[in-house]
């Protein structure tokens, strides 16, 4: 399985800022948007291109364009929505599919509650957006949904990932590519990533208990 931990200095700087427990909701949200753009840039680096001739200011000019790739972004509710604006800024023509799963805090298993996928997934590159890859359960359930709907080319974009989740994903979906700003140390006994970011959804939407 292809796993890319993006070591670009800007990515590492911003993920470090994101780990600050004192960071405001506004600051957290802005950094998530910026990291979404930077990570999507890396995740789309292997798209095929083709030559195209078009009118230029001094006559015909040959340029490179994406070779027929259609992209759907798949934010996992609700935290994945925080990454969506940054990725759409890079790929404004992308279709958006939405998946809602929540983790049962006792079993740590994902429970689906919403699914709205764009059509013709077999023709599209699907980019799953979620700040955290922890146990991998939510991600694998999302991939199962996408594959049942016909998706063949799937990538996951995460701010941080746990080794346990990566290992679980590789055992079930080795064809999926993963792009992340950081591979963290481990999961605690409650299934949370350490050192992690805290609850990314609460920090993005400002719903932390004070």
Swiss-Prot record:
Question: Any idea which UniProt keywords this protein has?
Answer: Allosteric enzyme, Glycosyltransferase, GTP-binding, Magnesium, Nucleotide-binding, Transferase
| Enzyme Commission designation | 2.4.2.9
Q: Pathway listed for it? A: Pyrimidine metabolism; UMP biosynthesis via salvage pathway; UMP from uracil: step 1/1
Query: How is the activity of this chain controlled?
Result: Allosterically activated by GTP.
Q: Which SUPFAM superfamilies match?
A: PRTase-like
Q: How is the cofactor bound?
A: Binds 1 Mg(2+) ion per subunit. The magnesium is bound as Mg-PRPP.
Molecular function GO labels: GTP binding; magnesium ion binding; uracil phosphoribosyltransferase activity
The highest taxon in the source lineage is Bacteria
What positions does the entry give for uracil binding? 193, 198-200
Kind of enzyme, top EC level? transferase
Residues that coordinate or bind 5-phospho-alpha-D-ribose 1-diphosphate: 78, 103, 130-138, 199
Q: Which cofactor does it need?
A: Mg(2+)
| GO biological process per UniProt | UMP salvage; uracil salvage
> Which CDD domains does this entry report, sorted A to Z?
PRTases_typeI (cd06223)
Reaction catalysed by this enzyme: UMP + diphosphate = 5-phospho-alpha-D-ribose 1-diphosphate + uracil
Q: What does this protein do?
A: Catalyzes the conversion of uracil and 5-phospho-alpha-D-ribose 1-diphosphate (PRPP) to UMP and diphosphate.
- According to its UniProt record, which protein family does this protein belong to? Belongs to the UPRTase family.
| Protein known as | Uracil phosphoribosyltransferase
